[in-house]
A protein has these predicted regions:
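Helical "lid/coupling" subdomains associated with nucleotide-phosphate turnover
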Residues: 1-218, 223-234, 244, 255
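Conserved beta-strand core positions
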Residues: 234, 265-266
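Short proline/glycine- and acidic-rich turn/helix-capping motifs at secondary-structure junctions
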Residues: 268-271
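Short, non-transmembrane amphipathic alpha-helical segments
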Residues: 245-265
Length: 271
């Protein structure tokens, strides 16, 4: 259960606080998840929260799993660390421990950049994190890699992303291992993410899947091929020496990626 960075509208938070503030101790004891040690103080805390929100008038309320410690932790960081995005820093460190291949996340990121030229800043951060975590389930059984990657990301103790962004990242890693965009296991994330987020996750996951097929996890190979969106086509541009060496799996991965973009897959050689 990940509460960190959970966000609700301020009015919704006030409504919940006012409801709890008028409950009796007996009623609170029957509520699931309410600690018996908090029963006496919970109504007063909710009353204080309601009054605080009435004065501050914020747009939303964001939960912090670190509490007051979050500011202390931040104050102890150097300037260079403060400048880093917390999700990218987390993904970089965790991904290094999970990674099987020598293929650098930066090589994957650079290879994908032309295809995602229209992404916004949030999507750029998620794409960076996804590249670092793209080998997260290599040691799981192939039949369960998509599911395990999805579950791991949903429960990662990672800062720097909202629940919607977490859902998008989890779907991305699921699609990286499996191409079915309607898998039942994705229901929770599909409900959390909006239409743009769902589309972005499917596109990025399919492109990551293609990248690993083309490179085999070896460094330096992705730089020999290019992936481009040209009019109504998703073009995989390969050197003439590779003509005839691309198998059916590569063609299917390209077709799946093109379908995510609503484009026609085309392999161009000798360009």
């Amino acid at each position: 259960h990940i509460i960190h960075h959970y966000e609700i509208a301020a009015e919704e938070a006030r409504a919940v606080a006012r409801l709890i503030a008028v409950q009796s101790a007996r009623s609170l004891e029957k509520m699931p998840g309410v600690s018996r040690r908090r029963v006496d103080t919970l109504p007063l805390a909710c009353l204080a929260l309601d009054r605080l929100l009435a004065v501050l008038k914020p747009r939303s309320v964001v939960f912090s799993a670190f509490g007051l410690r979050e500011g202390f932790y931040y104050s102890r960081l150097g300037e260079a660390e403060r400048a880093r995005h917390p999700l990218i820093a987390f993904a970089e460190e965790q991904g290094a421990g999970w990674r099987r291949f020598d293929l650098e996340p930066s090589e994957i990121f650079d290879w994908l950049t032309p295809v995602f030229a229209s992404e916004n800043e949030t999507e750029r951060v998620l794409r960076t994190a996804a590249c670092h975590l793209s080998d997260i389930s290599w040691d799981d059984h192939p039949d369960y890699r998509a599911e395990q990657a999805y579950v791991r990301v949903l429960h990662l103790p990672a800062p720097g992303m909202s629940h919607r962004e977490r859902a998008v990242l989890a779907m991305t890693l699921a699609y990286r291992y499996k191409s079915d965009p309607r898998a039942v296991m994705l229901d929770t994330a599909l409900r959390l993410a909006d239409g743009r987020g769902r589309t972005f996750a499917r596109r990025l996951g399919a492109c990551l899947r293609l990248a690993y097929n083309l490179s085999g996890g070896a460094p330096g190979l992705l730089t020999q091929v290019r992936l481009r969106r040209v009019e109504r086509e998703l073009r995989l541009i390969v050197p003439s020496t590779a003509n005839g060496s691309l198998g059916d799996v590569t063609a299917r991965r390209l077709e799946n990626a093109a379908d995510a973009f609503d484009l026609r897959p085309v392999i161009v050689t000798g360009a």
